[in-house]
Amino acid sequence: MNDRMVWIDCEMTGLSLSDDALIEVAALVTDSELNILGEGVDIVIRPPERALETMPEVVREMHTASGLLAELDGGTTLADAEAQVLAYVREHVKEPGKAPLCGNSVGTDRGFLLRDMATLEGYLHYRIVDVSSIKELARRWYPRAYFNSPEKNGNHRALADIRESIAELRYYREAVFVPQPGPDSDTARAIAAKHVVSAG
């Protein structure tokens, strides 16, 4: 069984796949216990000038405050950034198509990866582990856990955001998931039988 989880966070000039540019990508790989493997990578990408010119003001302010905007002139190419991330991921995930993409609201990140880093995106499993989904369920089913979740210091830098996502999943695992080893097989089967949806 492949227990690896690939955590990726992207910073962009906006959220539009047709207009905006990927300007930072970071990755960490964990095992199933959420232990980080290796040092990870965090890479700044130099965007096309047009993407900077059309960047929404709120995004410009965010990337100025985080220091990312000042680093863009020294950024690398998309191809080089993809090669660096892929090298790190392959070091810890030997088989393509096995490890899911993980993070917070990773659907947007996956869209930019598919557009700009298709080889990397294709190396990942099609499934995702989205911590924001767990957070939304906790808000509805375990509000005390939701409202007491770890405070985020989010500076909107990719690697820091990943570390916070991993910490958040560790918290929800401890606060809302059934303690290990979970139910025995008979109990699990009995629970499953209550939730079978009939065909037709």
Curated annotation (Swiss-Prot):
Keywords: Cytoplasm, Exonuclease, Hydrolase, Nuclease. Residues 5-169 form the Exonuclease domain. Its EC number is 3.1.15.-. The keyword Membrane does not apply. GO terms for molecular function: 3'-5'-RNA exonuclease activity; nucleic acid binding. CDD domains: Orn. Its main location: cytoplasm. Pfam families: RNase_T. It is found in: Cytoplasm. InterPro entries: Exonuclease_RNaseT/DNA_pol3, Oligoribonuclease, RNaseH-like_sf, RNaseH_sf. GO terms for cellular component: cytoplasm. The active site is at residue 126. It is an enzyme of class 3 (hydrolase). Disulfide bonds: none annotated. Belongs to the oligoribonuclease family. NCBIfam families: PRK05359.1. 3'-to-5' exoribonuclease specific for small oligoribonucleotides. This is Oligoribonuclease. It comes from Streptomyces coelicolor (strain ATCC BAA-471 / A3(2) / M145).
